[in-house]
Amino acid sequence: MERLEKQFFIIPTLQLATALLGKTFVRILPGNRVLKGRIVETEAYLGEGDEASHAWRGKTDRNAPMFEAPGTLYVYFVYGCHHLVNIVSEPRETAGAVLLRAMEPLEGQGFMERQRGTASASDLMSGPAKIAQALDINRSHSGSDLFSGEFFLENAPRIPENQIGTSSRIGISRGRELQWRKFVIGSPHLSQGQPS
């Protein structure tokens, strides 16, 4: 399958949140073990003006990868126990990233099940913290890019517009009016149900 190149990621964050749906996220572990998940849910986060974003007050040591080149991974730690995985989207020094909220496991499910402690396919990657745990991603991977080999995205047919849902972002206290969550309608792997 064709790997996505840098040009794919050089689009506005809100567009990337939609464009990522259906694409395959790949992690190559030591020993060439392959893990794959189909992206079925995302959320867009900008910088200045987006109070739900880590970068809305500017650049810090913690959020610095969010200001890197498009296609960079931004991984952060929350609640003292969870890692969340984002893909940087805006030009360098302009904050923007897409949070990977849910995936459908495609390859390496045995490893993912051991990582997660569950054999439920619909629950393996049905949330941003579950994705990081299933793929064994942590803060040490923040700043990695999607072009050097350990991580990359594979192309897949574009999801038709009538199969893409939109809602407000989940688990935030500010910016809830913004409809910046995107998801594949009907997927059993979503982090939360679809809005009625």
Curated annotation (Swiss-Prot):
<dbReference type="GO" id="GO:0006284">
    <property type="term" value="P:base-excision repair"/>
</dbReference>
<protein>
    <recommendedName>
        <fullName>Putative 3-methyladenine DNA glycosylase</fullName>
        <ecNumber>3.2.2.-</ecNumber>
    </recommendedName>
</protein>
<comment type="similarity">
    <text>Belongs to the DNA glycosylase MPG family.</text>
</comment>
<dbReference type="Pfam" id="PF02245">
    <property type="entry name" value="Pur_DNA_glyco"/>
</dbReference>
<keyword id="KW-0378">Hydrolase</keyword>
<dbReference type="InterPro" id="IPR036995">
    <property type="entry name" value="MPG_sf"/>
</dbReference>
<dbReference type="GO" id="GO:0003677">
    <property type="term" value="F:DNA binding"/>
</dbReference>
<dbReference type="GO" id="GO:0003905">
    <property type="term" value="F:alkylbase DNA N-glycosylase activity"/>
</dbReference>
<dbReference type="InterPro" id="IPR011034">
    <property type="entry name" value="Formyl_transferase-like_C_sf"/>
</dbReference>
<dbReference type="InterPro" id="IPR003180">
    <property type="entry name" value="MPG"/>
</dbReference>
<keyword id="KW-0234">DNA repair</keyword>
<keyword id="KW-0227">DNA damage</keyword>
